[in-house]
Amino acid sequence: PALLAHDKNELDLAQDFVVFSPSTDIDPDPVSSPNDPGSFRDLVYPESHAPQVQKSSDLVPTADLQARQRHIQLIRATKINPSDLQAWLDLASHQEHLVSPAVDASSMINSERKTLADLRIAVYEKALKQFPENEAPLREELLLRLLSEASITLEAQKYKQKLQDTLQQHLTSFPIWTLYLNACQANPVEFRFEDVKVFFIRSLRTLGSNNNANHNLEAQHMILYLTLRYTFFLRDTGYVELSIATWQALCEYHLFRPEHLAHLGRDFILADFEKFWESERPRFGEEGARGWCIHDQDDGIDPELRSILPDGKLASSLPFKSFSTLENTMNELLRFPGRTMDQPGNEDPFHVVFFSDLQEVLAATTSALSRDGFLDALFCYLGLPEMNDTTITQRLPASRRRWRNDVFLDHGLLHSDLAISDHSNLDENLMPCYQTSTDLLFSRAFQGLSRSSTPSDGSSHDQQTKPDVARFAQRILSSLVQLYPSDDGLAEYYLAFQLSCFPSEASRVAKKILKQRPSSLRLYNACATIEAKLGKTDKAIQIWTGAIKMKASFSAAAQQEFVLLWRGLIWCDLETNNAETAVSHLASFGCGDASIDSES
């Protein structure tokens, strides 16, 4: 008690008043301010080294103020250098920080998105004035971004009109055409088959009537791209016969045109082609097809009556199952265009394709088309990979590569059945999109196709290419190889297809083509590769070594492909576990055929 009294007395003497802070602010935080005298920080830090803690009012400018300051800097950059595209793009991108500071664009509400789109459109329109017409790539970049924002602010019909107006000034712009086609074809609300079909025909006519179409390679490939989109659209909407017939007609028209028509007008050429088509002789890809030019010289035999009536009937006990089976059978039998003499056993008015159904497309594509681009578009439609020819790839414009990446062109004719029957494996059946080589052609380029022309278990859902479609593609490639006897790359491509789809026939076909072209080292390598893939290693090595020994008999141009023989031979050694032989061949590469002679 005495101690307590002593403490109380000292407290009363020393603290008989209350000390207030000089500041008039009232701190709601019960914790002592770090700058208060006598605080813990005064004991740890000397006064001159105490850390300064800023209040919220003293922090750097807010996010809104930062965004405005950055906006001023970007505007200044565009004024200093108006031709700097990146400065304009940065300014447009920054607009989202003005609309909603410190908030990600994905979290914006619809009204904020439209406001942002309007701001960016204004930036792009101002930027376009700074770039003249001769700077097409820069203007195209700005236009694509402007159209992307316009799709947010404009109604569907106005957006399509905006795209159409833009296309009038940029008829050969592949990205803008793609946007336009997607807007017209992929609108589920306003989709009408006839409207979309008319749209494609009108677009082909517009592009085909361009005066520069005959000389502009990009314009030619845009015509091919439109044709691909049109025929894929027909096939996907159930008009398979018209889709296939369109490509048959285009191939006959552009690849097998009679020579005496070369200098005549379009109307005369179309009239002559009408006679050929309405004669109903075998057409491109069909059995017995010889081409428009051959038909023009030889009338041949009248077409035979074909009966394609299905054998199955509806079962009263299982009506739905039997109907499904019969429907699948009819789809396979009626897949390809029919003839008026056929007996399809139904009342399908679209099974027979007349010239009048094709006339508008042919008239719109009468301009000369590049052979390389045309063949690649045809292969894309069939679902085949690109050809192995780096020189062609370097010569073709970017649009040829782009249509290989188009989501609307993912599944070609050879893959269409797989896409319908098994949706779980769509990604596995996509067309390969990469630059092929000889090794890839004979390994995985055709891996999505069947290695057999008949289903393994008879199941309608077997993951294999339908025999009739594979045979159709086979006849097309065979006709092209005969049409271009000097194109060894095309012949190699055909043999790789044979190995994948019809392996039992591949060796015989390879020997036949090699006999016709005995000076092609590429075809020697293809023949040997086929034998090796079929398990006939000794025969493959015999072909490789025999061709290597004949090196001196080949021309200098042909010897440029001599490396293919050595490469194939060495890989064959490795795959058969003959490492020492492979090393020996690798060491003697380029030194003639001494090592081959010593082994034999």
Feature map (PLM): residue ranges:
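Polyampholytic low-complexity alpha-helical segments
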Residues: 1-600
